Amino acid sequence: KGQIPWEQGIDLHGLSIDEARDQLSEFIRASFYQKCQAVLVVHGKAYSQNGSQPLLKSYSNDWLRQLPQVLAFSSAQAKDGGTGALYVLLKRKK
């Protein structure tokens, strides 16, 4: 709900699927080791050229589910990108 302020963010606009996956994974790991509690991931709302679902949005959803450092995530508030961005809550580093 945006009640926990995000500490770092990443923008995946303009990246290929492979670049976005690698950068998102690296960003989440680095944020976790820096003991961030919440981060912002901007994937955008752009639809692919043939009018199908936004690729980075759906891929980001899948990738975040696979990362062990991620506790939860949800769409951001409008001021932070709305449905084109995600708040990601990270697990606490022990």
Model-derived segments and spans:
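Long, charged, low-complexity intrinsically disordered regions
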Residues: K1-A38, V42-K94
